[in-house]
């Protein structure tokens, strides 16, 4: 970074402002382990104190909005871990720390390690939901990885005895606290995966401090849980306790007892469900039989209606009705045709054809005579019009003009010769006469002089 210096002369206020900007921009936020001294808590709610070690000290302030989140009351001489911003108090030129977070030194270091490991594993994808394996439903055999002397195992067994006493349980005893605990937990997970005896595992312990639960914040334990082929339920501490194992496990239970309830079946609930299903089945069977009985009654009635004797009687009645209808129809048909025949005879008697034939024959002869006369008149008029048209055509025909002694000349490219400027001496002309063509060459061109008329005044 380039320093904001120039060749000018600094004022004190500008110097302090520049130093403050350098401190804030270069250092940013830091974690600091130190001892508290000169702690004061005025009515404003802000905290003012000094952070020191055996060789140096620095002033610090923690504003009310930040210190309200601190879960303990700081004391002089107490070792703490703080996260702070380095700044400079410009009026006095004193640099100081603005504290944003404060924890007791022991738990604070562990919490810092917890956050760093959590960020690391999260970045690697160990917490992704896509890696979570579903729990078997129902579980056929349960594995429990915990201490045999702890309250967690006692709680799990009591819950299973009450809810699902028929569920087989395999206990993988391990230490859950101390330096050896992480390796024992890892070995128990690997052993359960090698034996394939159970289809779900509970890994957990009872409550305790952050340091007591630290085995379940071990990176090696987290990776062993992640690589397990058997689904794992994490059940560490109380509901407010959160460990790395909770994030990596396929399912997190707030307590060991809750984990036992999650992986087991409630036999009383199952019994109620079976009874409910039995009642529903009985009702369905009753409805089914009633429906079938109703269908049987309908079919029986239809069968009786389709008995051969009944069908034969209905067919006989139908045949009698059809025969009567046929007889009535024939009688009506004969009667109607008889009346029509009589009317036709009367019309034929009144309409003698010989007189009509004679009358129509006379009309045809008259029409034929009129038609012939009209055709002859039309032909005569057309001949007269044709003769007139021929005379007119001969009068306007170019050939008739040529017959009177005129001619038509064309240039060599076929254009009609109208003016002398269309040709030059030596051009060949084609001249049309009445009885043929003459080809000639232009020897001389003479233009007619225009006569100027004198102006009369």
Swiss-Prot record:
Chief location: cytoplasm
Cytoplasm as UniProt keyword: yes
Gene Ontology BP terms: DNA catabolic process
Molecular function GO labels: exodeoxyribonuclease VII activity; nucleic acid binding
GO annotation, cellular component aspect: cytoplasm; exodeoxyribonuclease VII complex
EC number assigned by the record: 3.1.11.6
Catalytic activity: Exonucleolytic cleavage in either 5'- to 3'- or 3'- to 5'-direction to yield nucleoside 5'-phosphates
Coiled-coil stretches noted in the UniProt entry, renumbered to this chain: none
Enzyme class: hydrolase
Keyword set, alphabetical order: Cytoplasm, Exonuclease, Hydrolase, Nuclease
Family under the similarity heading: Belongs to the XseA family.
Subunit structure and binding partners: Heterooligomer composed of large and small subunits.
NCBIfam families: xseA
Functional summary from the UniProt entry: Bidirectionally degrades single-stranded DNA into large acid-insoluble oligonucleotides, which are then degraded further into small acid-soluble oligonucleotides.
Protein name: Exodeoxyribonuclease 7 large subunit
Organism of derivation: Photorhabdus laumondii subsp. laumondii (strain DSM 15139 / CIP 105565 / TT01) (Photorhabdus luminescens subsp. laumondii)
Lineage: Bacteria, Pseudomonadati, Pseudomonadota, Gammaproteobacteria, Enterobacterales
